[in-house]
Each structure stands twice: as structure tokens, then as C-alpha cells.
């Protein structure tokens, strides 16, 4: 991935950080079995009163033979689900496919896709967060090692 010096610095140093009321989660900080579709983050001390979750950045590599219109991010502990035929199953972060071959878009204010959500019921006592990227329809996405995303979680401290 071609990065500017500033972009490279941000990519390497965003990592998992805890501020008084914000947790920055980078999918490259995986714990548990290595998988590019799934990852878990252990949070210590546990977070109480999570109120908002926001997708700050997504850079998703293209699996071979992919013709998916978008990918979905799921995190059950935060109520971030995947839309189903029966209707919505909670908040869904959508990573759309850009019109350029081999490129996934960043989120921006002009983007109609959801990238920030207030949690309906504040999540309490979070000590582990499990994230998963799925294809349209719910199958495993088959992400590559160059795929990652950064999520910001706000909570009452």
C-alpha cells in the first residue's frame, strides 16, 4: 500500500489506545486465532456504559473473484449486527465497493452508508470485543492481510 509519510505514521501508531472516554480499536491488533475476517480485542479494565460506536477508517483488500456490492462489520457485544432478509438485526457498518476496481472507499460526510451509531441500550461491562467482516448475504468475506479498519467506541467513564 502506497502511503505518504504522514499516512504511514498514522497506520503504524493508531493501535489500541484508551482516552478518558474513548477507545480506539484497530483490527490489526488482533488477539486469539489469526484470521483476517475475524478478530477479538481484550479490554482491561472493562468498559461500562458504552454509548456510541463509529467507524473511523476502512481499507479492505479485494478477495479474488469478488463481485460483492459491499462488506459488513459485525460486533455482537455492541449490537452491531448484519441485516437479514427478515429485516435489520441491529446497527450495521457497511463498507461499500468503490467503482474503481480493487478499491474500497473511505467513509466521508457525503457517504450515505452508516459509519456512526448511538447505541440504543448502553453496553455495560465490556471486557472483550469480537469483530467479523462478512460478505453481502452473511458468508465469510475472505479478507487479505492488507485489510483493516479502525473503530472508535465512546463510553461513560
Describe the residue ranges of each PLM region.
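The ATP-binding site of the protein kinase catalytic domain
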Residues: 1-157
Amino acid at each position: 500500500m502506497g502511503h505518504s509519510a504522514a499516512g504511514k505514521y498514522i497506520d503504524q501508531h493508531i493501535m489500541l489506545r484508551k482516552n478518558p472516554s474513548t477507545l480506539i480499536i484497530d483490527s490489526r491488533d488482533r488477539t486469539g486465532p489469526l484470521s483476517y475476517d475475524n478478530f477479538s480485542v481484550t479490554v482491561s479494565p472493562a468498559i461500562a456504559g458504552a454509548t456510541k460506536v463509529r467507524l473511523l477508517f476502512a481499507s479492505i483488500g479485494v478477495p479474488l473473484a469478488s463481485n460483492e456490492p459491499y462488506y459488513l462489520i459485525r460486533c455482537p457485544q455492541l449490537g452491531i449486527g448484519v441485516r437479514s432478509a427478515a429485516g435489520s438485526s441491529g446497527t450495521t457498518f457497511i463498507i461499500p465497493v468503490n467503482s474503481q476496481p480493487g478499491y474500497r472507499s473511505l467513509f466521508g460526510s457525503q457517504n450515505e452508508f452508516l459509519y456512526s451509531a448511538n447505541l440504543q441500550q448502553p453496553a455495560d461491562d465490556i471486557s472483550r470485543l469480537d469483530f467479523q467482516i462478512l460478505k453481502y448475504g452473511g458468508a465469510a468475506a475472505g479478507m487479505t492481510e492488507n485489510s483493516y479498519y479502525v473503530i472508535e467506541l465512546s463510553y461513560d467513564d
